[in-house]
Amino acid sequence: ITHHFGGIVPMLEGRIGPGWDQLGARTSDEDLSLVLKRLKKRPLDYFKHDFYADTAVFGGVPATHAGLAFYDLDKIVFASDCPFDPEGGPVFIRESIRAIDSLKLTQPVRNKVYYGNALRMLRLSLTAAPAAKSAARPRRK
């Protein structure tokens, strides 16, 4: 999972793509032919389609928009950098939700980002929690 929507990668797609496409072509001291033979697609395509990205960009709407446009929607997972904010967690959670909800996303896409992709990636299922037992516990004085 790339943190912070992959950092600057979505914003530098136009540079990273051609730059990595030339891997080894402009370096005189390294033989990268083995690396190039193992790549089955453009290096940029690994970022876009194989990496997961989290939404921890502290509520930045432009960064959220860029990340959603760059990565496959099935590879984006909600994150907030909690508890590292001035309130110990709630600010970044709240602002991340605000940023995502400010964009024109369908509810199914929001569901993927908020929990669906993480459930699939972690091979978990969304099931109802078992009912809590109502046995009374003695109160401490």
Regions found by a protein language model. Name each.
Residues 7-8, 32-34, 52-77, 83-141:
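Mid-to-C-terminal alpha-helical segments outside catalytic/metal-binding sites
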